[in-house]
Amino acid sequence: SGTYDYAIEKDLISGMILSLLHENTLTRTTGFEEIGEQGFEHTTFDVIASNIPFGNFRVFDAELWKKGGMYEQATKTIHNYFFVKAMELLNEGGLLAFITSRGIADTPGNKFVREYLVNHADLISAIRLPDMLFMQTSGIEVGSDLLIFQKHTRKAALSQREQLFLQVGREKADATGTMTEYANKLFTIPKTTLATGSRIVQNQYGKYVRKYQWQGNENAMSQYLAALLKLDFGRYFRKSLFMGEGQGSEDLSLIHISEPTRP
């Protein structure tokens, strides 16, 4: 038994650095859509993790295009594509862990992706991250979520949390009745935000949104995030499903995806 660690990095220089820092990781400098051409020992994986890119640009993936329907639709925006492609590459019981823009959870038009995810996997954890989280590294405020799923294609029904994850809503922004932009209803319940507070503000586009803040040091934030994840994994993660329920394989295959277009 052993762990097989793979990494995909699209940027050449970043890929070279990554391969030097992690000598035991098999690194390929290419796009995620070309993973099937890399000659990895595994074609499906137990864990797929990334801070994924976002944007309204298409990805050419012949395999998903041939499937048509929502698979082809997912290739029209890169963040939707990453979720669907990764879920297709997971072993049953495997974990998908992505930091992503809030568009996946909040945009009404992305409901088809949310439906695909909760119908193919159990929602383990959904945590709304503070808007300033990437300020030091990227110099911009960006709304992000940490979403973790465990692939479970034979699930009987959606949980209450998963049903909430499908829904979006708006809030009153002021006394005149101006409404905020849409936001996912799951983040209205306790223990789903990495924040000490939130308020409605106007963003750089003049739209009203709910902004999340963390007032405290990074160590305290890390400890609170760890506590949230421990709580969610204790409640929702199925170890027997992850281990294959006695199917015999003791190898663990992990893939990390890094993309230069994401802060």
PLM region spans:
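Conserved S-adenosyl-L-methionine
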Residues: 1-50, 55-57, 101-103, 119, ...
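Flexible, glycine-/basic-rich loop-and-beta segments that form/coincide
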Residues: 136-250
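Conserved Class I SAM-dependent methyltransferase catalytic core
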Residues: 10, 73-133, 146-148
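Conserved nucleotide-binding/hydrolysis micro-motifs of P-loop NTPases
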Residues: 54-55, 103-105, 133, 153-155
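A short acidic, often aromatic-flanked loop/helix-cap motif at beta-alpha or helix-coil junctions
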Residues: 33-36, 132-136, 196
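Residue-level detector of conserved catalytic or cofactor/ligand-binding positions
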Residues: 255-263
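Short secondary-structure boundary/capping segments
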Residues: 21-22, 63-65, 112-115, 142-144, ...
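Mobile active-site "lid"/loop adjacent to the S-adenosyl-L-methionine
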Residues: 53-82
